[in-house]
Amino acid sequence: MVLLLNPLENLKTYISNRPPLVIFMVSVSAVAIAFLTIGYFFKIKEIKSPEMTEDWNTFLLRFNEIDFCISENETLKHGLNESITPESTVTSSQTRSSTQSPPLLEDPGPINISVAITLTLDPLRPFGGYSRNITHLYASVLGQQVGLAGREAHEEMNITFTLPVAWNSDECVLHGRCEQMVFSTCMTVTAASNVFPVTMQPPHCVPETYSNATSWYKIFTTARDSDTKYTQEYNPFWCYKGAIGKVYHTLNPKLTVIVPDDDRSLINLHLMHTSYFLFVMVITMFCYAVIKGRPGKVRQNNPDFCQEKVALSAG
């Protein structure tokens, strides 16, 4: 009865005599709190799906690492009231790739996907601009330049930027030098279907409606990925008399693949049940410590029994 009337004393005795169990109780309590917090986090937050390693956000962000060089020495291609069609964007490079390895029967061939993206053109000082109205920029890159691996690393992607307004040397003459230009362009990527992510696509743009010029000039550009800047292939005079183009993609939360609500609810339920079980375990041990905290008295050995045991051993 005395022990039952002194719960605080029992608890102190339990803590002082059983430190391993106390540490175990504290550890279990910490794990239970962690599970409870993680479960609540899964309930209120949208979590990116770990099963989908690449979506359109990550795919377009890789183009931010590419430098495009618009050089004065490039040849202009002239067109009259012509639009960028799937046939016009397919170049001889795709013909070369088809001759190297026979296409699979299931391969539908190159496809076009057009998305709106920001393009900056930063002319270097020797660059004087173009007297013609440039409305289209064209480039060709490999999959490895945008971070693709495996078979997709050797796939060629043809990129066409359709400018909303013509780009020429009028601004250069007006300011005495060419200033940086920022365009909201329509970027058309032509490549094999396996290059593109299989997740929800961003809103598409229509290249034919992006530029209202009756006649246009397409200029071919060269591309360089960011890794080249740190290798022996780096050329400090690359694009010396030209303009460097950079692509900037703004993250679109709608393109990120998230864990479905049903899965998040199931995860939250499992974590809650686990934390409740651990809390019940800790509470049970705590109640035991309060009710019966003092260890039982150690039974003392009988001296006569010890002497008899010694005598038997000596005999």
From Swiss-Prot:
Question: Quick one: signal sequence residues?
Answer: none
Query: Pfam families, per this entry?
Result: TMEM219
Extent of Low complexity compositional bias: 88-101
Membrane topology recorded in Swiss-Prot or TrEMBL: Multi-pass membrane protein
Q: Has keyword Cell membrane?
A: no
Annotated spans, Disordered: 81-107
InterPro entries membership: TMEM248/TMEM219, TMEM248/TMEM219_dom
> What is the name listed in the Swiss-Prot or TrEMBL entry for this protein?
Transmembrane protein 248
What organism is the protein native to?
A: Danio rerio (Zebrafish)
Gene giving rise to this polypeptide: tmem248
